[in-house]
Design a protein with these regions (language model features):
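Extended basic (Lys/Arg/His-rich) segments that typically form rRNA-contacting surfaces
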Residues: 1-228
Length: 228
């Protein structure tokens, strides 16, 4: 099955130790198991993909009739979280009911993780856009205010794209090129280096990184000349 990604849940952060003893910050992700709910084909839908459902079952009375019929047609139990993943091979014979597991990833490869970031509410320019702020000295009455937002008689308006205070967070973000540090196939766990958007317990989408990093090339050590 040439599925390019998998659905999961962010469990939290931990650290593992490399061979040289350095601590590596990692995010623990529950990657699957997922079940194929629908198969999209190029002839019918214009592209090749599968709709996955994260195996986190929900009571039938908690979903509407449209989703009830959707799951019934696929022959799978109702699930809480659905997501669509493109197929690498158009000739892939994936069908509804097939399972997608974390075994599709390998230690050392890089992945992109997408999720909804933590909501911060209404925030000012200093926190939201990293404004420097005014002077903190005695007599200053300008500390965390936005400051000037435009020019004089020209253009007599505020330029588009100015950074202002406003709602911060609660947006779909993607952490790119995170290295897979460890895989636990028995518990469907995936450990990636670095941080991932969203709080613990948030739904995420894991896909192979579009930009795979190359392994660092270590130059061979030069042989020292023999002492005479």
């Amino acid at each position: 099955m040439a599925v390019n990604g998998i659905l999961g849940i962010k469990l939290g952060m931990t650290q593992v130790f490399a061979e040289d003893g350095t601590a590596v910050p990692c995010t623990v992700l529950q990657a699957g198991p997922c079940v194929v709910v629908q198969r999209r084909t190029r002839d019918k839908d214009g592209y090749d993909a599968v709709q996955l459902g994260l195996v986190e079952f929900i009571k039938p009375q908690r979903i509407n009739k449209a989703l009830t019929g959707h799951f019934k047609k696929a022959g799978v139990a109702p699930m809480r979280y659905l997501g669509e993943v493109r197929l690498q091979d158009a000739k892939d014979e994936t069908k509804p009911g097939d399972r997608v597991l974390v075994d599709g990833f390998q230690v050392g490869e890089y992945v992109d993780v997408s999720g909804v970031s933590k909501g911060k509410g209404f925030q000012g320019g200093v926190k939201r856009w990293h404004y420097g702020g005014g002077e903190a000295s005695h007599g200053s009455m300008f500390h965390r205010a936005p400051g000037g937002i435009g020019a004089s008689s020209f253009p007599s308006r505020v330029w588009l794209g100015q950074h202002f205070p406003g709602h911060m967070g609660n947006e779909r973000k993607t952490s790119k090129t995170l290295r897979v540090v460890k895989i636990d196939s028995d518990e469907n766990l995936l450990l990636v280096r670095g941080a991932v958007p969203g709080p613990s317990g948030a739904y995420i989408y894991i896909s192979r990184a579009k930009k795979q990093k190359k392994a660092p090339q270590v130059a061979p050590a030069k042989a020292k000349p023999a002492k005479k």
